[in-house]
């Protein structure tokens, strides 16, 4: 049976301050610029969750959408919408609440929960995409998906000056 991908898009508004405790104040300002504002700043995020699995012959669907929406509400919207991300236990410490790190946390939660949405446990998380601005978006492929992108031969990369 072919594997199909289904993507659902969610919206949330949240604020954060990018500040690494391992850097001094000047290094933080140099690294994060206006994103290091002591009061934080906000974004209207769009989060795409892509799942992969067989199409159910009875329903014609890859995923039970109300179950996926309930998971997103509980683990994404209720947790981060209208919140200051620095107050979240995951980001309350050395883990800077960048959009990339938000993606890592969302991927971690959904990777464990998505298979439970399917009684046959054939459904898998494929990708998390977070759009931070109209110009910036971040994709995280779930483990197993990224292996196909890693070349078997390692090439030496030169740093960009």
Regions found by a protein language model. Give the residues of each.
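Charge-rich, low-complexity N-terminal segments
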Residues: 1-161
């Amino acid at each position: 049976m072919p594997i199909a991908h289904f993507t659902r898009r969610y919206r949330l508004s949240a604020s954060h301050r990018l500040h690494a405790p391992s850097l001094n104040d000047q290094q933080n300002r140099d690294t994060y610029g206006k994103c290091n504002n002591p009061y934080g700043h906000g974004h209207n995020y769009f989060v795409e969750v892509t799942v992969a699995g067989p199409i159910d012959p009875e329903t014609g669907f890859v995923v039970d959408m109300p179950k996926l929406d309930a998971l997103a509400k509980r683990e994404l919207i209720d947790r981060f919408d209208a919140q200051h991300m620095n107050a979240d236990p995951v980001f309350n410490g050395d883990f800077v609440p960048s959009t990339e790190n938000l993606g890592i946390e969302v991927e971690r939660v959904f990777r464990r929960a998505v298979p439970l949405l399917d009684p046959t446990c054939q459904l898998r998380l494929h990708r998390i995409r977070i759009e931070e601005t109209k110009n910036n978006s971040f994709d995280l492929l779930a483990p197993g998906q990224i292996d196909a992108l890693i070349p078997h031969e390692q090439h030496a990369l030169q740093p960009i000056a």
